[in-house]
């Protein structure tokens, strides 16, 4: 797991500094034409898909997956990774990506051809799945604003995980749309910081 955590620092250079992974800002060298150039005449067909990718938990694997996306200009909306099979040294990477149906199929095909990849599942189309994301929110405020933030948190079933005289830190788990909605509600109530894990997902049997 330490190996993948080390690799994850590579992602932070592109993702957690407010930059979206796309052909515009992580394209490397003279890589081939962005896949998103292919969609210019089909912008109304852009879809969002959640992919579950099973890989070896070894040095360099995550960097290779990220390199595939950046080199081809594929977009990453969210990425999470963790070991799930300790004895087999395998990890699951959950990627939320966007593109036309053609681009999505191309992404899955190219991931499937990578040597350290054992399995690629498109959870968006392979039957029902369960998706969740965890986020923590720091909200600053006093008096009525503070009380209003607490009432909003109760509506969304957010937990208070830390509090000071002038702040609350809330924890919320749910679909990304729920996280987004709670963030919008908290903005006028003193929202200062958000930290999000990204989407994790499993196929329902």
Task: Tell where the protein language model's regions lie, with residue ranges.
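Long, contiguous binding/interaction regions
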Residues: 18, 22-48, 54, 58-91, ...
């Amino acid at each position: 797991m330490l190996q993948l955590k080390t690799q994850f620092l590579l992602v932070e250079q592109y993702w957690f500094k407010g930059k979206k992974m796309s052909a515009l800002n992580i394209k490397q060298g003279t890589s081939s034409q962005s896949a998103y150039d292919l969609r210019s005449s089909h912008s109304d067909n852009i879809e969002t898909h959640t992919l579950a990718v099973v890989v070896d938990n070894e040095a360099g694997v995550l960097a290779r997956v990220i390199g595939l996306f950046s080199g081809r200009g594929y977009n990453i909306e969210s990425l999470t990774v963790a070991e799930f099979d300790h004895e087999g040294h395998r990890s699951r990477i959950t990627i939320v990506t966007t593109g036309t149906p053609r681009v999505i199929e191309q992404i899955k095909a190219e991931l499937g051809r990578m040597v350290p990849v054992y399995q690629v599942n498109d959870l968006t189309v392979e039957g029902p799945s369960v998706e969740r994301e965890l986020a923590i929110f720091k909200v600053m405020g006093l008096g009525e604003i503070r009380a209003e933030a607490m009432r909003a948190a109760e509506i969304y079933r957010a937990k208070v995980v830390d509090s000071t005289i002038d702040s609350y830190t809330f924890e919320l788990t749910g679909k990304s749309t729920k996280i987004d909605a709670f963030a919008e509600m908290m903005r006028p109530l003193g929202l200062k910081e958000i930290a999000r894990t990204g989407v994790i997902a499993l196929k329902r049997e």
